[in-house]
Regions:
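Membrane-proximal basic amphipathic "stem/tether" segments
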Residues: 1-74
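Short, intrinsically disordered, low-complexity terminal segments
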Residues: 4, 85, 274-276
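Residues that form generic nucleotide/phosphate-binding pockets
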Residues: 4, 8, 50, 72-76, ...
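Short, mixed-charge, low-aromatic patches
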Residues: 27, 75-84, 104-111, 180-184, ...
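Short acidic/polar alpha-helix capping motifs at helix-coil junctions
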Residues: 34-36, 85-92, 166, 191-194
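Class I SAM-dependent transferase core
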Residues: 51-53, 64, 77-116, 129-131
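S-adenosylmethionine/decaboxylated-SAM
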Residues: 112-115, 121-289
Length: 289
């Protein structure tokens, strides 16, 4: 029934409803019930979330196992773990991702006072900062926290002499509201289905990094991966977020490359954490661009 109602509402109405996140008390009580958090046993957690937290379906939190993610990325890229760990620490102190984002969202009811990039955001930041890609492609935008993270990493790269850009696809008009205006000059957002929209969005360019956060559907993700592989740069890294991870595993087996699944350990949050799959589907033999 819930999925049927969502379909009837349409993307625009759903986006407007999400803007009332802090006021959706009944919905949030249901979220806690699904995660077995009860008022009588965990009153502080229950009340804090229901009364104050705006997030009802996509959660943000600090991670307790960033070191594990860094180890996965070091194994995938061949780059020193110390270098990747230093890039991971940049996220916590970056002006745009901390105070800048807080200033822009202070009047919004659907955004936390401090947003912490989660597993796939952090993985994307580290790969962009370390690899300095010319082109990143993202399928699935929603409010655009991942887009913001990638664009800020690209901006820092450009300031260091290594420019790049982001191409994103989402079916929802108005997606990406968290992205600051000054970061949009290196961003192209297509309102299109990623399964069919990637070829036109990428054109003759080559993809260095692909982030799939669209639908938890294996056939959908497989179509995205096939489109990206046809336009892959000599070195292509892929991050697949949540849901069915079968598609990336299937491609990995076909290409004979390893696919690693990272499971988040959230700090101080009732959500048990997401799973992301990471792989290097093309490799020209160099660990750095």
């Amino acid at each position: 029934m819930k999925q049927q109602l969502k379909a009837l509402m349409g993307e625009g109405a759903r986006r407007r409803l999400r803007r009332l996140g802090r006021l959706r008390w009944i919905t949030k009580a249901g979220v806690l019930r699904r995660h077995e958090v009860r008022l009588r046993t965990s009153p502080a957690t229950w009340l804090r979330y229901v009364l104050l937290d705006p997030e009802v379906d996509t959660f943000t939190y600090r991670l307790d196992n960033v070191d594990e993610l860094v180890a996965v990325l070091a194994a995938q890229t061949g780059l020193p773990a110390a270098q990747l760990a230093a890039h991971a620490r940049e996220v916590e102190t970056d002006e745009e991702l901390t105070r800048g984002l807080a200033r822009r969202t202070r009047r919004r009811l659907d955004v936390k006072r401090r947003l912490h990039p989660v597993g796939h955001h952090l993985a994307a930041w580290v790969l962009v900062r370390a690899r300095r890609p010319a082109l990143v492609v993202e399928a699935g935008v929603l409010d655009g926290l991942a887009s913001l993270v990638v664009l800020r990493a690209l901006e820092r790269n450009a300031q260091e002499g290594a420019p790049g850009r982001l191409v994103s696809l989402d079916v929802m008009p108005g997606a990406g509201s968290l992205v600051a205006p000054h970061l949009r000059e290196r961003w192209t957002l297509h309102v299109a289905d990623s399964r069919t929209g990637i070829p036109a969005a990428v054109g003759e360019e080559r993809v260095d990094l692909f982030v799939s956060d669209s639908l938890p559907d294996s056939a959908h993700v497989r179509a995205e991966l096939d489109a990206v592989l046809a336009r892959a740069a000599p070195t292509l890294d892929v991050i697949q977020v949540w849901g069915q991870l079968d598609a990336l595993h299937d491609v990995g087996r076909e290409l004979g490359v390893p696919v690693t699944v990272f499971r988040e350990r959230p700090r101080g949050h009732f959500y048990p954490g997401n799973r992301i799959a990471l792989a290097r589907l093309r490799d020209d033999g160099r660990s750095a661009p």
